[in-house]
């Protein structure tokens, strides 16, 4: 007679780690989603969200059930390594449904009025792997380059907040900021954004992808999409969604993020590989 298996199912983990200015709201959202996912038969699921320091390791975790990623790594480092659940809609300037535009910010006192005026100036960005902070700005600047160069120097700040501070304090002249991040900074830490203004916006691209492990099966993927859609439409959670700027959810797949690849390819075709 076959022996009964006592191997426990691995605990699935989740996070919403990309917008860090409202951790209480993010934690509350995860608790609601985790409870609904357990009620649909998924589990065991971690009681609290992760706050990863190594994003690539987190996104590649085989125990990953649900998290946010960035569109640029999705089409580069994460190809065939995750599955896309969809994207939230955000009710902030620069967002339209699941699509968004980066906000290019400069000091309010800077007399420049066009992107071309920043030739030879200093740019700040959060990471070279960022769609909003790097890839979209590179695509926007690419038609203006001469011999593969536009900016005189650059500063890798490490986060959108630090990029904004660098511009505000004169350590850099211009930066491209995720529109939801900028709205969150203005709401939760307004002192950071005083003294800056939006110069222009990038071309549109899909917002942060909600992803799951590549090993997640089709049935579980459908459950994830259904649970998130139901939660977004739950009037009892309206205050939470408003606090997080979330106004909807749209199922998407990897193909929706081809525009991120197109931005990279377009810049490279114009001999512009690095800001």
Model-derived regions: residue spans:
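Hydrophobic residues within well-ordered alpha-helices
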Residues: 59, 118, 167-168
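Bilobed "Venus flytrap"/periplasmic-binding protein-like clamshell domains
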Residues: 12-36, 97-163, 238-239, 243-247, ...
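Short beta-strand-to-loop elements that line the ligand-binding cleft
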Residues: 43-51, 65, 149-159, 197-198
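Surface-exposed, charge/polar-rich loops and edge strands
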Residues: 153, 159, 206, 227, ...
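A ligand-binding cleft/hinge motif common to bilobed small-molecule-binding domains
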Residues: 69-79, 143, 168, 173-193
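Short, hydrophobic alpha-helical packing/hinge segments within bilobed ligand-binding/sensory domains
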Residues: 52-57, 160-166
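Periplasmic-binding protein-like
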Residues: 86, 94, 100-101, 190-226, ...
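N-terminal hydrophobic or amphipathic helices and topogenic motifs
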Residues: 1-81, 90, 97-100, 236-275
């Amino acid at each position: 007679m076959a022996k009964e298996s006592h191997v426990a199912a691995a605990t699935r983990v989740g996070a919403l780690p990309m917008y860090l200015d409202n951790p209480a709201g993010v934690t509350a959202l995860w608790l609601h989603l985790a409870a609904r996912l357990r009620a649909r038969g998924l589990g065991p699921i971690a009681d609290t969200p992760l706050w990863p320091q190594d994003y690539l390791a987190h996104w590649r975790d085989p125990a990953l059930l649900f998290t946010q990623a960035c569109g640029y790594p999705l089409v580069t480092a994460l190809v065939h390594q995750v599955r896309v659940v969809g994207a939230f809609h955000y009710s902030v300037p620069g967002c339209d449904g699941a699509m968004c535009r980066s906000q290019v910010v400069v000091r309010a006192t800077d007399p420049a009025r066009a992107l071309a005026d920043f030739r030879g100036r200093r740019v700040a960005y959060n990471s070279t792997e960022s769609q909003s902070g790097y890839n979209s700005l590179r695509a926007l600047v690419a038609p203006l380059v001469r011999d593969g160069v536009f900016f005189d120097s650059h500063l890798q700040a490490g986060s959108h907040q630090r990029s904004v501070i660098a511009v505000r304090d004169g350590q850099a002249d211009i930066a491209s900021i995720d529109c939801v991040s900028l709205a969150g900074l203005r709401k939760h830490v307004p002192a950071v954004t005083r003294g800056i203004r939006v110069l222009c916006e990038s071309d549109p691209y899909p917002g942060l992808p909600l992803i799951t492990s590549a090993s997640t099966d089709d049935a579980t993927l459908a459950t994830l999409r259904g649970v998130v859609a139901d939660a977004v439409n739950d009037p009892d959670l309206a205050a939470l969604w408003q606090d997080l700027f979330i106004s909807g959810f749209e199922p998407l797949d990897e193909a929706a993020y081809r525009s991120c690849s197109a931005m990279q390819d377009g810049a490279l075709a114009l001999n512009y590989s690095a800001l």
